[in-house]
UniProtKB/Swiss-Prot annotation:
Residues 240-250 have a biased composition (Basic and acidic residues). It holds the Pfam family Ribosomal_L2. Residues 232-284 are annotated as: Disordered. Keywords: Ribonucleoprotein, Ribosomal protein, RNA-binding, rRNA-binding. Part of the 50S ribosomal subunit. Forms a bridge to the 30S subunit in the 70S ribosome. GO terms for biological process: cytoplasmic translation. Transmembrane segments: none annotated. The lineage of its organism: Bacteria, Pseudomonadati, Chlamydiota, Chlamydiia, Chlamydiales. This is Large ribosomal subunit protein uL2.
Length: 284
C-alpha cells in the first residue's frame, strides 16, 4: 500500500510514499496506544560510515553519492543456516539500507536474527530452515526440495555462500525445471538460469512490492537519501566532459560517456565469452 498527499506545497504535489501498513509498531509490542515504529535490535545493528561514493584512494568511483541522513546498518542473515530450529516472527521492520522490509526472528534457543521479510509475513508466524522444512511462506530449503512452479527469493549462487539473487522489493523467481544436479529458474529479468540443486532459497516474494510506485516529489528528499544531482554533459566545460563547451548548443558529436566511450547502442559485451548456466538470455 502507498499514500498520496494533498498538493499543499510543490513538494507534496507529486509525492507518493509507502503507507508502511505491514510494519510492526511499538504499540503492538508494548500494548500501548502508539504508532511509532519499532527500534532496531541493538545487537544486530551498528553505525556504518558513508563512503560518499569514494574508493580507498579518495577518488570518486560512483558519481552522484554523498550526504544524506545517517543510517544504522542491520545485520541480515542471508545464509539461513540455522537448521531444524523453529523461529517466531517478532516484528516486521523498516530498513533504510534496502528497498525491502526485514523481519526479526526469535529462535526456540533464544537467538535472534534478521531476515528479508517475504510478502504477507506477519508478527507471530513460524518459520524454519533446512531439509524437511514445510513448504510454507518464509521457510528456507534447497532448490531440489522445492516443487515446480514455486515462487522463491534470496537465492544462493553457490551452496553455502548466502543469498545473492532476487533480494530487492517485490521481486520473485520461479522454479521452472529440474535436471540431475541442477535446477532451472526464471529470474525477474526474464532470464532462464541454471543453479546447483544444493543452493538454498526462501519461499515467497520479497515484501514492499509497491516500492516502484513511490515518487520522491522533490530534490530535497533525494538529498536526504544521499543522492546528489546529475549534471548534463552539455552544461559542463570541455575539460569536464566530451559534450562540454561550445558557443551555445551544438550537436556535432556522437554521444559519449564522461570518459569518452561511445554510448547509446554500442555493444561492449565480448561475444566469445558465454555463460553456460544461462539457458535463455534476458536480452533475446
Amino acid at each position: 500500500m502507498f499514500k498520496k498527499f494533498k498538493p499543499v506545497t510543490p513538494g507534496t504535489r507529486q509525492l507518493v510514499l509507502p503507507a508502511f501498513d505491514e510494519l510492526t509498531t511499538q504499540g503492538e509490542l508494548s500494548g500501548k496506544k502508539t504508532r511509532k515504529s519499532v527500534r532496531p535490535n541493538k545487537k544486530l545493528s551498528f553505525f556504518k560510515k558513508s563512503s560518499g561514493g569514494r574508493d580507498n584512494l579518495g577518488h570518486i568511483s560512483c558519481r552522484h553519492r554523498g550526504g544524506g541522513a545517517k543510517r544504522l546498518y542491520r545485520v541480515i542473515d542471508f545464509k539461513r543456516n540455522k537448521d531444524g530450529i523453529e523461529a517466531k516472527v517478532v516484528s516486521v521492520e523498516y530498513d533504510p539500507n534496502r528497498s525491502a522490509y526485514i523481519a526479526l526472528l526469535s529462535y526456540a534457543d533464544g537467538e535472534k536474527r534478521y531476515i528479508l521479510a517475504p510478502k504477507g509475513i506477519k508478527r507471530g508466524d513460524q518459520v524454519i530452515s533446512g531439509e524437511g522444512s514445510p513448504f510454507k511462506l518464509g521457510c528456507c530449503m534447497t532448490l531440489k526440495s522445492m516443487p515446480l512452479g514455486s515462487t522463491v527469493h534470496n537465492i544462493e549462487m553457490r551452496p553455502h555462500s548466502g543469498g545473492k539473487l532476487v533480494r530487492s522489493a517485490g521481486l520473485a523467481a520461479q522454479v521452472i525445471a529440474k535436471t540431475p544436479g541442477y535446477v532451472t529458474l526464471k529470474m525477474p529479468s526474464g532470464e532462464f538460469r541454471m543453479l546447483n540443486e544444493g543452493c538454498r532459497a526462501t519461499i515467497g516474494e520479497v515484501s514492499n512490492s509497491d516500492h516502484n510506485l513511490c515518487v520522491d516529489g522533490k530534490a530535497g528528499r533525494k538529498r536526504w537519501k544521499g543522492i546528489r544531482p546529475t549534471v548534463r554533459g552539455t552544461a559542463m566545460n570541455p575539460v569536464d566532459h566530451p559534450h562540454g563547451g561550445g558557443e551555445g548548443r551544438h550537436n556535432g558529436y556522437i554521444p559519449r560517456t564522461p570518459w569518452g566511450k561511445v554510448t547509446k547502442g554500442l555493444k561492449t559485451r565480448d561475444k566469445r565469452k558465454s555463460n553456460k548456466w544461462i539457458v535463455k538470455d534476458r536480452r533475446k
